[in-house]
Amino acid sequence: MATTNKVYFIAGGNRGIGLSLVKELSSREGTTVFASARKPEAATELQEWSKSHPNVKTVELDVTSQQSANEAAQSVAKAVDGIDVLWLNSGICQSYYTVMEAPEEVWNAHYQTNVLGPIHVFKAFYPLLTKKKTRQVIFTSSECGSMGDFRATGFSAYGQSKAAINFTMKELSVELADEHFTFISIHPGVVKTDMNADAIKKFTETSPEMLTYLKKVTIIPEESVSSMLKVVDNLKPENNGSFYRYDGTIIPF
């Protein structure tokens, strides 16, 4: 179906930062927003929002499965002729261990969701992106994945997964440069979400210094999203391959 709207797909649009993105983008004129959830029927707040915003469509997606990603893309292709912006926001942060302490299953879970997940989704949605001229792909990343601004945080598997996805973003920015894509990674800040609440709870027990830091820098999802959208709304081809903080400053890889 042809549409003149600007079309967004938010992977992981059912809670936290992703849900705030859905709400902000769907409140704009001339937008269509697809929001994914692993179990859409359980995403009650997203479902309620979509009832009052007919430009929001929910899509079932398990990012750890290439088949699920392919099926999600096929579902979207039945509704629109292409997408402008793919925002790869799905992720987990359940690694509050040192490298020596982290169990193998924790490393595997973070790699499957935070690294292979975005790759699965991008590969599935690549044909839909090529149908539009915008061709913007946004990876929600983290400063924890920066080598150039490295800080020992105790987020071992999480930090490693974000470093890996930053590499993937950079590699894609070169591989598909001739196709006029714009890829970026963006750190949303330390955001007050259920995921970060778990981190605060953990550091209450293990690291008072980290707890103090997290409480000092934590922002609400709406602040993070409004700031990130200022970056994304103003992207230019020369920004391809960049790693940003939510406020638009550059993070070294």
Swiss-Prot record:
GO MF term set: alcohol dehydrogenase (NAD+) activity; oxidoreductase activity
One biological process term in Gene Ontology: cellular detoxification of aldehyde
Keyword 4Fe-4S: no
EC number(s) on file: 1.-.-.-
Main location: cytoplasm
Annotated active site: Y158 (proton acceptor), K162 (lowers pka of active site tyr)
Domain of life: Eukaryota
Keyword Cytoplasm annotated: yes
The protein's name: Uncharacterized oxidoreductase C663.09c
Organism of provenance: Schizosaccharomyces pombe (strain 972 / ATCC 24843) (Fission yeast)
